[in-house]
């Protein structure tokens, strides 16, 4: 029987004149939480349940659908800049590819909570008695009118207003602990359509008009409008329902809990959370909870205790041993009685029902077996009561009553709180750049890299910088390239420092944006001499002098603590800075002019570096002009013949060519500061591949912090691509990194370091195993909200796969799918 009598916003009246207020519980991220964090969530939920001393609670986990096309269309609104047309076409192609792979919609779990509103007793006086009699009489007339005419359902405006006030108080209580949203008529209708087999409609695309006719004393709605979402042919069999619509049919079966045969220990009892990851098909769950007050619960427990004592005495008098079941039950009852007496808590009558649907009977049987096995592993025995399918179906409807008393479980608030209601794995944004999908839930993951600086509610960082860490071949460069590419398509600008020259063919492999790709390949040819001279490359004279000091102290090893050499070097640099022709070669000339043993020694030391052809890029006589332009959307800077030191090489062991290579990286990275300080309205990226090479030297570390801080102020993100999280784990840098991506690692110390970098429990063996077992292209990701999950990076297009793949080519084509 359809229970709903009237709906007003989030209030639902049933045929017994009970009123429920329904809310959507905004899911909270539960993945990779520490045990302490899980207990905090558990306590909040337990308090939420325990605050109701009487009445009923109706909790629903519903597998709804969200439209992939709608999300992609929303993402298109974020696109700006010169490449807008290319980006729109790319997103459209991406949409078609995703729809062909996973369908128009993806499963999205939503959580609903309904609380029965308990009327406070009015003061007994003549006025209230008259009002009560009047309302009863009017209700009788309305019922007669509805029975005879079956058209309109009416509700007294006074009645509505009374419950609206009560609902406001309840909403205030709940919202202190969890994020909630009041339901609307559309939500109830969408829920009922789903329960009656109407699938394939995304919530965003669903409409449900519920016209109301407001009179002076009452409000009318059409009864047909209330029951419209339930329209379908329902055929009941012993173990399932067949739901038929004009264009589709589905089969639905219902399970209820027969017995819980073991302990559900928290944390590890979060059924609602784990079943989202376990099942590839939608599963709905209903918890109909009746609150039993503490006094009544104690009376029930003590009566049960008397029954058990009688059984024990009877066995004793008969000369038999008391069965182990009775002994265990007596222990449990004693413990429960003590607990209830001390805590003054309520008990809860729980009716737990699971709904499984499928397009045909064979698939329904397979899914039912899978659900039963999953609950069996948790020591929960399910049963599918024959002939009760329609009644159990009714338990899912808003404001419904418990259908059957045979399968009631008496539980405490701890048990209900430990089921993980509302827990899910959430990553990224609702719209933006599609980078892949969650390995655990299969949900698409979207990012908006420029969002951090906007101060969006809920974010735990305002840092635009990102880190990509992991061992060789895990996929960090691929992920980094993909994110930079789409950021440029969406209207951003990027400078990529490409020390290994892996991106030199992008103009050929990415023809759609070739005109906006600028590849600067710095060779040791004569025409390039001096292009990386600090005095030449920096626009500002002071910046050039500062960088010259950094480079020359780095190359010569002269420390600020060296009271003899340092002042001489700085004096020479300052004189060159003030001259007309500024260049590092002129610093040597200036030192020789001093003609002291110390100045000649420093001049000879610097001059020794110029003997390398490769070093000509760094040294100029002040006549070279800066020809490096970063005006394109995507700029790639390569330096031929760079020789980076090995990751484990200490600074003291660097060869001369390695010193020069790192010095050039520092110069180019500093040059990126000018790029960062360009148009603040455009999101910019400075991408530092092999970042460890200069993060491991003092000058590079200082520069990194400078880049990150400038980037945050000027709407620019610095992307560090490096092999070890230790390179970016120093507090000064770590706290300024927003998005984090960690790819596979097998070294235990590195794994622990990475988990610490993510703010996770580094000693947790499960966390370590997740990172160790990541496959190629999978990464641990932390978003701007501090949420962590495992993502499969998904380029969608094979041309992007080939363009961004930095692995050596193989002779035969491999099927990457």
Give, region by region, the residue ranges found by the protein language model.
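Extended, folded cores of ATP/NTP-driven motor/assembly subunits in large transport
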Residues: 1-410, 421
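P-loop NTPase motor domains
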Residues: 35-53, 276-279, 292-299, 380-381, ...
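Short glycine-/polar-rich loops that comprise or flank the Walker A/P-loop
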Residues: 53-56, 109, 490-492, 517, ...
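P-loop NTPase motor core of the ASCE superfamily
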Residues: 100-101, 540-582, 729-817
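Charge-patterned, long linear interaction tracts outside catalytic cores
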Residues: 125, 439-445, 450-452, 457-470, ...
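Conserved P-loop NTPase motor cores
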Residues: 312-314, 450-484, 497-504, 520-525, ...
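Post-Walker A helix-loop "phosphate-sensing" segment adjacent to the P-loop in P-loop NTPases
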Residues: 485-495, 509
